[in-house]
Amino acid sequence: MEGSFNILRYDHQKSLWDDFIESSKNATFLFERDFIDYHKERFDDFSLLIFDNDELLAVFPANLSNDVVYSHQGLTYGGLIFKDTLNTNQKDEIRTAIISYIKAHKVKSLIIKPLPEFYYSKTEGISNFWESHSNVIKQHLILAIDYNSDFKIHKTKLKRFNKLKSNGFIIKESPEELSVFWNEILVNRLNEKYNAKPVHSLSEIERLKRAFKEEILQYNIYRNGEVLAGITIFKKGDVVKSQYGIASAIGEKLNALDMLFVYLIYLFRDEGFNYFSMGTVNDNSELGYSEGMLKQKQELGCRIFTQDIWKVDIHD
């Protein structure tokens, strides 16, 4: 018992956890247990459930590594997910209880990578709790289109898009497009261009697609029967996010990825979404971000949002 709260480690309370996530205005499907646990063998789970008597007030997706609690190393973002009716003071009391709980478990520090701001309800009270209890150790630049703003796509990209149909390009979306994209483009091109691998293997993303049929979509663009580029989309609430997006060598010469992005930008605008996130542009360069990726995403109509990574030192 931490103050008036009862804090429990997650231990197969899947239905309780998932029901809470689904009822929250500000959670995403990445916080559901089927997503968190698809690679559970890689992480020592330290997820927490916070109760007031029998009432679940908050959940905290997290993992433990070398005396540090992270929220969460296996997810794009983490942080506390609260019951929607809580006010700012109640949320800060829970944050304090979390720190006390992990201190009692001999944890040295807590690192939190919160949801980008556009996932949050506009009416939610803003707390300065982390500003006074932690330090910013990194700042990610997140590029996203705000559909409620007067966003503009660069005229060159629009010109290419306008030739999409007349030049014989075809766009397909189906579960089967995942294996086409992974096997024919994504794995090889990430290795060639960045000496990197996808975060998800093909079997993992297919398993996630089966669990989240409506939230994970794969769009590929073809010409003359050849796949040229693909974009993997994660959808939640009024936000869509491009999780992967890359072209083949031929597709790059034909600007196929630009055409596919512009197609999706208009598609999701017309479907009523508020934001289209294209992810971070941070890298290991001296600047800390890719100038080329920043320019590319800004030309697609994105603006910069920041995501602060917080570190709380736990003192004895």
Map each language-model feature to its residues.
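Short Asp/Glu-rich motifs
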Residues: 121-122, 183, 286-288, 316
